[in-house]
Structure formats: structure tokens, C-alpha cells
């Protein structure tokens, strides 16, 4: 029985669907290929954050309670802008796509206008701004029953009121990109998020903490969108190989080769079975493996041939999907042309 296990395993691998990764370059949403020498201005802080501390009626206890922040709103706005700047520079620097002029140096040049940046060789300037910070709040009370034992051992029931400060923070962060030669805006995008936090308030010490981390978390959440906006990146499209149905015994060797990691042998076998037997799964799989080797032209031509001759729905779906990946890859490669 032991000697049969490897055989059974190979049969299982041959019958199952295997995922093949197809590498491609996902283009950035804004084509920045002509603006890789990028000056980054300091983030403009939001002006106007105001927090309503409000008086809260304390049901059944002290008549009024005032809740006080323990931080300066001006400092919070400045710190948020500073953190946004460090995150932005970190994201762009890590991409390796740009030659960057740091905010401090950009500020010195941009004060004389875009021409000064252009004359210094910078093709575009990124103007980041925190365009909205809002912190709305309310206090809600929760009443719960308490149970205590009196001196005589009898249970005493009571009511206790607890207070919860509910804070909802909203942050909007806007990036503008300007061509330093023409002064025209290349692109603009705003990122917006909101978060809610509940804090239990002690009526004897009704204060709440600095909201700095609250806004920092939202800024970190923008990094992925900023990267997609400005940086072409390598990604992987995972495609499932087509199962051996209708089953062709000769195709088993191709699936086995793939299961053992020999993609080139699997590709050659699948292609041969399509050319000689017109076996649709083999034709589809040969196309996907060609794409995984970076040959999108051969892959698409083969899938077009399969669809044209057989009208197979699976092949048509693969053709549509792979055409989209190939198109994105072409744009992405244009954006990264000349990049080391």
C-alpha cells in the first residue's frame, strides 16, 4: 500500500487545478513617467479645527459635567501635517521610482515660484495639504444596576450611571501635482477617512487624551492609495490552469511536470497537445504558461486561436482576463521605461 501513495498523489495533482502566477507591471493611475524628478512641498496644515467641549447633563447625579481636551488643536494640526509629510516621503522614497527634492529644500525654491524649481531641473512639484480635520463628539450615558451586601448581609440594589465620550474624527488629505514648466495642474486627488472612538469618562476627572494617533492611523491608511496613484508596481495575476476535461490521458504528463515545478516542459507538452490534438484545456494552459514566462503576445494569439476554432467559453473568459492584464502591463512598462 505504501508504494501506491506516491502514485495516488501524482494522480491527485494531475486532476486538480494549479494556480499559475503571471507577473505584470500595474501602471500608476497618473502617468508620472515624464515627471520622475519630483519636488515635494511641505504639507500645508489644516487651519480651523475646533472641538466643542459642551456641557453634559448628568442624569441622577451632579447636575452638569464638562469634558475637557488635554491637547492643543493647533498643535494637533501641525503634528498631523508633519506626520503626513514623513509618510509621503517614505512612500515615494521606498518606490525607487522618483528622484525627490525634500520638503525643506522645495520650500526654499517654491517661494520664488515654479520657475525656480524648473530652472533647478525639477519637472513637477507635489503640493500636499490637509484640507479637512473634524472632530465631532457626544457623550452618552449608560445606566446599570449595582448589587452590594449591606452590614446585615442583605443585598442592596442600586443604579450607577457611566459616561462614554463618542468621538468621530474626519480627515481629508489632498495631493496636487503641478508641471513646473507650464504651471498647469497634472492631477489632483483627495483621500478621506473617518474613525470613531469610544472613551469611558470619569466624572471626577473628565478629560480625554491626545487624538494624534487617531489621525496618524488614517494617514497610514492612505499610503496604499497614494502608491497606486503615483507609482507603477509589479504585481501578480493568479490564474487557475484549466482542468483536464474532457480528459486526455496524454495530458497527464504535462500536469505532472507542472506539479514538479518544471514549467517549461509543461508548456511544451500542453502546446504540443493543442497543436496535434486540439485539446482545449491544453491550449488554454499553454497560453497561461506562456504569459507566466512574460510572453503575452504568444499567449493572446494562442487563446484567440482556441476561441476562434472552438468557441469555448472558458477560453473566451481567459482571453478577456489576460487581455486586460496585458494591456495594463503595456502601460506599466511604458511608465517604467528606462528605470534601473
Model-identified regions with their sequence ranges:
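Structural motif
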Residues: 8, 30, 117-118
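A structural "domain/chain start" motif
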Residues: 16-97, 233-340
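Long, contiguous interaction/recruitment modules in multidomain scaffold/adaptor proteins
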Residues: 80-245
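Sec-dependent N-terminal signal peptides
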Residues: 4-14
